[in-house]
Every structure is written in structure tokens, then in C-alpha cells.
Amino acid sequence: QCLVGSEMCIRDRNKEDSYGDKWFWAPEVYYVEEDKKFYMFYSVEEHICVATSDSPVGPFRQEVKQPVWEEKSIDTSLFIDDDGTPYLYFVRFTDGNVIWVARMTDDLMKIKTETLSQCVKAEAPWELLQAKVAEGPSVLKKNGTYYLIYSANHYQNKGYGVGYATSKSPMGPWI
């Protein structure tokens, strides 16, 4: 379902429009002015996908029905820096849920695997109450400092919380 103005609408997903057919979650929609398109990044079958549309309410379609890379990953968040460089933050299942970043191709359809860099791994006591989980990344930039906001611990634990790390580069290192 979606909200347009004060009206609720329902969008049925057409299986032919995207990779995968189960476990859809964590969609984020971005408008890229340069392309005059909306990009929806989402997780499906524990893979990262991106679909495009001319409207923020869709329909969204994948021209090529495949993930942005083959490794299982979730919780994507796009960040385009002031110089136009696109970065994708996401969770890899490397010793728990760990937040990583990679530069994207200019068309925003693939990550550049040679640029993969670890950002945040659950290490602080509050992050380890039930599981090694750092997830749900989002990046903001203010006055030359990058802020990576994330959730940590297991979502079913009362200690599930929000943390942040800072860096002078979108690729880290994050402190």
C-alpha cells in the first residue's frame, strides 16, 4: 500500500518486474535529479536489489532481474556525496550482521566490489546483549563530517538501540 496525498492506494507487485519472490523488506526510495528517476533499493531473498520508476509510488521495475551483487546482504541505504559519487551502505552476514559500504556504478545498478569497506561491527557491550547485530544504516553529511546512524543488538531484545559513528570520508574509517 502507499499514500498519495490523503488517498491510500494499493500496488500489487508483478512477479515479472523484479528479482526474487519472497522476503521483501526494507525499501528505500530516492529521487536522483540528474536522471529524473526514482530508485527503490530493497532486500529480497537476502539479496540487495534496485528498481526504477518515473513516479515515487511506482510501478518500480528492474530492467535486469538480478541483485546488485551475488552475496547475501540486506538493509540498503544509498548516499550520493556532494561530488556525485554514489555509495551503498548495507549489511553483510560476516561474523553477525556487519555494516559495509561500496561505491556504486554510475547507473546505480551494481556495486564496485573492489571498493568494499567494513564500517560498523557490533562490538560495544550494548550492541552485544543478544546477538552480533549492526543493521539499518543511514548516512548524513554535515560540515564535512559523515554520520553513520544504525541500529544494534537483536530487534527482539529490549536493549535494541540506535548508535552512530563519524568519519571524514564516506568510506571510513568510522569512529
List PLM regions with ranges.
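Single conserved hydrophobic/aromatic residue that forms the stacking wall/gate
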Residues: 1-5, 10
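Surface loop/turn motifs at the tips and blade-to-blade linkers of beta-strand repeat domains
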Residues: 18-20, 67-70, 121, 128-130
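Structural motif
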Residues: 47-51, 96-103, 157-164
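Short loop/turn segments immediately following beta-strands, especially the blade-tip
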Residues: 51-58, 102-112, 165-175
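Loop/turn-rich, solvent-exposed surfaces of beta-rich toroidal or solenoidal domains
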Residues: 132-175
